[in-house]
Amino acid sequence: MNLRKVWGSMWNRSNSCKDSTKAIQVLPRSCSSSISVFDQLPMDILVQIMMLMEPRDAVKLSLTCKALKRLVGCNRIWIFYLQCLQESWDSIFFAETSLRCGYPLRMVSSESEELSFMRVYGQRAQVPDSIIIDGGSGFCKFGRSKNDSPSRRVTIFREFGRIESPIYARLQQFFETIFNRMQQVKPSMQPIVVSLPLCHHDDTESAKASRRQLKTAILNVLFDMNVPAVCAVNQAKLFHSLSAFLRFRAVFFSAVLALYAARQTSGIVVNIGFQVITVVPILHGKVMRQMQENNITLSLHAVLTLKECYVALDYEAELSRDAQASMEIAGTLSKQRFFQTGEILFQPRLAGMRAMGLQQAVALCMDHCDAAGLTGDGSWFKTVVLAGGSACLPGLAERLEKELHDYLPSSICNGVRVIPPPYGVDTVWHGAKLISNLSTFPATCN
């Protein structure tokens, strides 16, 4: 019916262009005498007709004959359908070409002919709605994977204390609170994607034991809540099923999720969290712990409080300016205090702390990555992705990039770029959303 409706408006244009446009025979006469006039219709027009249909109607049309089946299977049509979805096409394309094969990552050919987007569309439509829980060190964001953003947030440090401390009762209260605040959600009905808090990053045996202890405690709590499937996001490492009801697979470090949200598979993630700054090198989705820079511990309560803070591109030049601004926080603060608060990240001594600055920690990490010589081109670590609430300070990405270019030798600094948090404070949550909506996600998490 749709074909007949469109045909009337297309036929005259097709006749007028007959001499200049070569007709392409795509339908055999045996298909149907009522649509035999389409035999001489150019391919581009047929594709445009298909795009006017609903995806389900296009699939039904493909059952008519082999020629229509080949036409409906055209990637161009299904790329159009995917572009009409709420999710960004760039994110969909990145996920389906870079992440669909699981770990270790294997890039699908950039020429999309090897990937059937008709199959991708159908598989994505069948992916169940998951609950994503991003348990950061300061705040927790949670919501459904089909939504555009987290539905709720809770302040972990106020309500639950140090959530990474693997105490069963505390974790049980944490997850029960989340499910109680999400209306019409039962733990036993939907898969869960968990991004574990950034903690115990070192490559020491004690840190490894702490990570295992935390994961075991979380699994035990969710198991007792009858969760059907858990895709726990922490390390790039697979775990075997613990039972027929609770499966613990496709495990990623939360820094990897921030990298995926920026549509990258290799680079350095700088997470500026509630109290700890971590510099995490990642190669093809795997955390390179042996090259990871030690954590920088700073108290960022002031940065979290002063929402008008920013980072000056040139600190000395900004100091010399006589501009003033004010805000009400136990009195009046000058604009100088606004950017001086952010300057602590680069000059911790301003706050009386003995620690290396952010630019020094990132540069040292890059130097370790360069010396390791893991890849031929040596550029995998030159993309820096910022994550964490305090990383959203205006001017931070530009300042860090400038400092790195000034601090690093020319052999390394060429090509270095710093990407601000792609989704602000929700960057890690969106990285988990990218994975949970993958066409291959059910196979990964079952």
Language-model-detected regions and their locations in the chain:
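Conserved phosphate-binding catalytic cores of ATP/NTP-utilizing and phosphoryl-transfer enzymes
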Residues: 112-125, 223-270, 431-433
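Conserved phosphate-binding loops in N-terminal lobes of ATP-dependent enzymes
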Residues: 77, 120-219, 288-291
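Glycine-rich phosphate-binding/hydrolytic loop that grips phosphoryl groups
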Residues: 239-243, 258-260, 299, 355, ...
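Short hydrophobic alpha-helical "box" of cullin-RING ligase substrate receptors
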Residues: 41-53, 64-72
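CRL adaptor-proximal regions
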Residues: 1-41, 48, 80-120
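Phosphate/ATP-binding catalytic cores across multiple sugar-kinase/actin-like superfamilies
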Residues: 174-182, 344-380, 399
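Conserved phosphate-binding/catalytic loops in two-lobed NTP-binding clefts
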Residues: 228, 232-235, 254, 401-433
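Phosphate-binding glycine-rich/basic clefts of nucleotide- and phosphate-handling proteins
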Residues: 189, 283-355, 382-383
